[in-house]
């Protein structure tokens, strides 16, 4: 496995790394979130994943993240070791087994330990903390529904997810802006999501299931996708009518809708208007 290579420094601070890294999983397989935290610090990373790994990391000078969940009688040991350029750093924490969302808490703690190690080693502090691939507003709305006030929620997000003060302010502002719209939703209403899983190029930070259509072989398949998408819209409209649902909003995305040609996009929007009653949509 290749050693890490620093590409860019500024004021003696590492800005960009390119390297191969192995992530080892012992006692769990929280790939998505652990990999997501790594990408906060190393956007150009290349991963190898080893599941059912040994409880101890390998000898040698490879770059790795080694994660452990060791469940004991009453407690679970959570341990993260990171090796970069031959230097390893370890953090660990134990949690009680008797937890309502045991797996979620194990995953969260492992991500916090990993974040703290990389924050110290790399010298940057991603302002959304360990939140990756999730809309913070959804968390705020969920916690409000449990009866928590905003002060309690902010303290919880700061302590448990390491979200910075400026991002907390933004998240609460967004939640407050959305709340009147959510309250105004009608009974039996639904939102239509029209998936266009194509882009003209793929962004390095993207976590969506989308494909760059940069070759003729790929673009040749788009017409067929549009044809089948229109059939799916017709079937979805039939179900909506049977269930007496009212269309509230339409979202076209996925991908990048304008990756389709103007004619292809027109075909999709025509199908939406043909099969659905859009008169009451916002």
Placement of each model-derived feature along the sequence:
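Canonical Radical SAM [4Fe-4S] cluster-binding loop centered on the CxxxCxxC motif
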Residues: 188-226
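Amphipathic beta-strand/beta-sheet edge segments enriched in Tyr/Trp
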Residues: 63-98
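Short Lys/Arg-enriched alpha/beta "domain-start" segment
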Residues: 20-62
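Conserved SAM/AdoMet-binding glycine-rich loop
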Residues: 231-282
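N-terminal [4Fe-4S]-dependent radical SAM core
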Residues: 122-125, 145-192, 243
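Extended acidic/polar, glycine-enriched regions
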Residues: 95-106, 110-114
């Amino acid at each position: 496995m290749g050693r890490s290579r620093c590409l860019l420094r500024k004021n003696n601070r590492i800005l960009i790394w390119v390297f191969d890294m192995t992530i080892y999983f012992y006692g769990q397989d929280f790939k998505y979130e652990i990999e997501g935290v790594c990408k906060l610090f190393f956007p150009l990373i290349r991963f190898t994943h080893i599941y059912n790994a040994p409880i101890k990391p390998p000898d040698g000078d490879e770059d790795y993240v080694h994660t452990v969940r060791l469940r004991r009688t009453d407690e679970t040991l959570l341990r993260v070791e990171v090796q970069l350029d031959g230097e390893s750093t370890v953090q660990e924490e134990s949690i009680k087994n008797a937890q309502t969302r045991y797996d979620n808490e194990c995953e969260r703690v492992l991500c916090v330990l990993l974040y703290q190690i990389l924050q110290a080693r790399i010298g940057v502090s991603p302002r959304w903390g360990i939140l990756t691939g999730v809309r913070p507003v959804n968390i705020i709305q969920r916690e409000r529904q449990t009866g928590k006030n905003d002060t309690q929620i902010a303290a919880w997000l700061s302590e448990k997810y390491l979200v910075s003060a400026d991002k907390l302010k933004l998240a609460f502002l967004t939640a407050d802006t959305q709340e009147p719209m959510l309250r105004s939703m009608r009974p039996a209403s639904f939102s239509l999501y029209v998936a266009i899983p194509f882009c003209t190029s793929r962004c390095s930070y993207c976590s969506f299931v989308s494909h760059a259509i940069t070759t003729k072989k790929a673009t040749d398949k788009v017409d067929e996708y549009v044809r089948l998408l229109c059939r799916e819209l017709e079937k979805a409209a039939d179900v909506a009518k049977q269930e007496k649902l009212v269309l509230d909003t339409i979202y076209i995305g996925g991908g990048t809708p304008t990756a389709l040609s103007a004619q292809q996009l027109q075909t999709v929007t025509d199908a939406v208007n043909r099969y659905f009653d859009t008169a009451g949509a916002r």
